[in-house]
Amino acid sequence: MDTKTLIAAEIAKVVPELEQAAIFNLLETPKNSDMGDLAFPAFSLAKALRKAPQAIASDLAERIDASQFEKVAAVGPYVNFFLDKASISAQVLTQVIADGADYAQQDEGQGRHIAIDMSSPNIAKPFSIGHLRSTVIGDSLAHIFAKMGYKPVKINHLGDWGKQFGMLIVAYKKWGNEAAVQAHPIDELLKLYVRINAEAETDPSLDEEAREWFRRLEEGDQEATELWQWFRDESLIEFNRLYDQLGVSFDSYNGEAFYNDKMDEVLELLEDKGLLVESKGAKVVNLEKYGIEHPALIKKSDGATLYITRDLAAALYRKRTYDFAKSVYVVGNEQAAHFKQLKAVLKEMGYDWSDDMTHVAFGLVTKGGAKLSTRKGNVILLEPTVAEAISRAANQIEAKNPKLANKEAVAHAVGVGAIKFYDLKTDRMNGYDFDLEAMVSFEGETGPYVQYAHARIQSILRKASFTPAVDTSYSLNDPESWEIIKLIQDFPRIIKRAFDNFEPSIMAKFAIHLAQSFNKYYAHTRILEDDPERDNRLALCYATAIVLKEALRLLGVEAPNEM
């Protein structure tokens, strides 16, 4: 039990007017450490007890069992708790050293599945920085879900169907060169895609041709299908190379095309339940009772189905296949209305498990304040960006540690980690402006800064030849150590908060805070000095490294032992 929960529990024993959870949320950290480690404001009880807050605080301080604390004292309207730092630090360090990387592992999920719809790039288009957010947020959430005891199922719902394939087939047949596409598939396909979109603005007949080719593709035309399959295969080879670089893997690549034969069932179910209404020749589901003004367009007047029809089929398939406890869609905020409709239609169909579905939305990545667009050719491609980040990391490592043995592997871990961490430290609903120089910096709130703190600790432990003894109790009570102990003790709650809010930035900010606290400790403490406290200090370093490495792992970022 962490100290905040312990204090809330002790207060709850003598304050029946408040739930323990409410007490927990009221606890404050005093600005001055001389006033204790945590404080309970008695104002919240003044109305119920009809007493002055100062009198309530004084009464509570006398009635609370103080045996587990150094001291409990009333100061004005607050009950201040002074923690037994030596005892708590011993408990925390013993726990972390014993558990290692399993420290803070939780069993809330009990092995139940969480489906994660993530990454989902469009076939025949380059993997850009715009796709990065869904990929790294989804990957981090998968690690966090597993830490909470769930079994994540990472689904790459590929954009491998739609009118754009009609456009691409027309472009390839008009201007494409097979040898050029085979040599540089994504580059060539992007050029064709940008060109046909530009020319279609002045030549409407190209749109008609594209629609015709997509109709042929839907009907199984051999030439159209072979071209589509080729575009898909070449794109996947490219994507998988990039996923390998990012250290991201998937459990399923079932994309839009996978559900082509599963949508008729959705239409039949909607028809059987009497939910489909005709509107101007199209089929819709009215959702006004859910506060959604616009009906969900299920089938257009020309008989074509829409994204929502496909997503309904996907939701049904995933529930039947994985029996998920939760299903999350890591998709940009611009799709918020779509996912509200999706959940509402499923609810209307009688599927209460739609309440377990969450749209994990996020803001846009911009460059110089401008929105990125593949169609207009305004795009930051991921592959050269990753290469540049690794190169910059290598240059910094060369300057700091030219004798480092495994420079290439470390540069890769730092460069890739820098890009991922910068994205993940941003509250996901906020966008950010892409700045590679800021990302790869070893100073400030960056991935390399946190990684360097971990590598610094490993260097200290190597110099000391220190490995903690599991049967030894280590404890510290100085202010700098205590700041680190409190953070380490808080790690399980940080994981739970990140899980509850689907928010990796909570984990990234924790990692920054822990790295900063350790660097402050390093600057003020002679860790390797040969005195009776040396092993206690080294045990703190050892535990800090475990938690830093695990926090980075939950973000999908490596923690090199040397930098």
Swiss-Prot record:
It is found in: Cytoplasm. Its EC number is 6.1.1.19. It holds the Pfam family Arg_tRNA_synt_N. A motif ('HIGH' region) lies at residues 121-131. It catalyses: tRNA(Arg) + L-arginine + ATP = L-arginyl-tRNA(Arg) + AMP + diphosphate. GO terms for molecular function: arginine-tRNA ligase activity; ATP binding. This is Arginine--tRNA ligase. The gene is argS.
